[in-house]
């Protein structure tokens, strides 16, 4: 009797729009379409890393219920419009940006002054409309995070004390806007009781639908891997024989850490600890890296963010690493 479970052999990605795509995988054993589809959907909506405006200071404004002379919108509507700006930070956890403009007409996200490592995905998005003689001057703090974080959770934190004029925003960090899935029938030879999983994903443009699925799947793998490492390794008795000599690693793990484009300080700290490949890096824990001379919390956060953008985290386990023939320099 056949006891091996089928694994998907066909993966198809169909672009439905600029930020929408349909991802189809088949075949699955009966029931696995719903099992995996629901798990992926929940992770996509709740656990993806993204960036959002979290605080704003507007010249001449003391609180969100104010109005500004020469500006058509009140402050509440300005904040709502600001939440619609899609930011993408490269190799940093947070940044404070400036927006200054005067003269009649719309003020868009393209008017925000950004450094080279900050990207605005929707520069045409309107933030305010100025009347004759109007002007706007604001400072916008952008941070990375996961999911939805109400402003009340950070408003009176010890690290960022409440100050007059500082308006704390509710932040929706997730780059995934909508996810739905359906399970259809699939057939392999004479078997007609199989599943086909169809995921339809819409993002805000900061990530592609394919990258979002890839990152969410890796999060699930990392979480489920804990159950395969129960004390006593009792699950090993049920595993199929594995040829360790033919262990295949994700190609990204075999790339040098230089390709992560870390700051010079972070890169030198890693090399000093003989961490040359991404596969070496992800097996280190946060505590281990913090013990590295000259590598502080800021550098650690940079490393974590760069890894997260590739669907990786610190503290992962790799069997049979390093692979035979890998140059350890």
Curated annotation (Swiss-Prot):
Pfam families linked to this entry: RNA_pol_A_bac, RNA_pol_A_CTD, RNA_pol_L
GO terms classed as biological process: DNA-templated transcription
GO cellular component terms attached to this protein's record: cytoplasm; DNA-directed RNA polymerase complex
* UniProt catalytic activity: RNA(n) + a ribonucleoside 5'-triphosphate = RNA(n+1) + diphosphate
Q: Is Transcription found in the keyword set? A: yes
InterPro entries given in the database record? DNA-dir_RNA_pol_insert (IPR011262), DNA-dir_RNA_pol_RpoA/D/Rpb3 (IPR011263), DNA-dir_RpoA (IPR011773), RBP11-like (IPR036603), RNAP_asu_C (IPR011260), RNApol_insert_sf (IPR036643)
Q: What is the top-level taxon of the source organism?
A: Bacteria
CDD domains from the entry?
RNAP_alpha_NTD (cd06928)
**Per the record, which residues fall in region Alpha N-terminal domain (alpha-NTD)?**
1-231
Question: GO molecular function terms here?
Answer: DNA binding; DNA-directed RNA polymerase activity; protein dimerization activity
Q: Which Gene3D superfamilies match?
A: 5' to 3' exonuclease, C-terminal subdomain, DNA-directed RNA polymerase, insert domain, RNA polymerase, RBP11-like subunit
- The disulfides recorded in the entry are none
Keywords recorded for this protein, A-Z: DNA-directed RNA polymerase, Nucleotidyltransferase, Transcription, Transferase
What this chain does, per the entry, is described as:
DNA-dependent RNA polymerase catalyzes the transcription of DNA into RNA using the four ribonucleoside triphosphates as substrates.
NCBIfam families given in the database record: PRK05182.1-2, PRK05182.2-5, rpoA
**Membership in a protein family:** Belongs to the RNA polymerase alpha chain family.
Complex formation? Homodimer. The RNAP catalytic core consists of 2 alpha, 1 beta, 1 beta' and 1 omega subunit. When a sigma factor is associated with the core the holoenzyme is formed, which can initiate transcription.
Its domain description in UniProt is: The N-terminal domain is essential for RNAP assembly and basal transcription, whereas the C-terminal domain is involved in interaction with transcriptional regulators and with upstream promoter elements.
Q: What is this protein called?
A: DNA-directed RNA polymerase subunit alpha
Q: What are the top taxonomic ranks of the organism? A: Bacteria, Pseudomonadati, Pseudomonadota, Betaproteobacteria, Burkholderiales
Write the gene name: rpoA
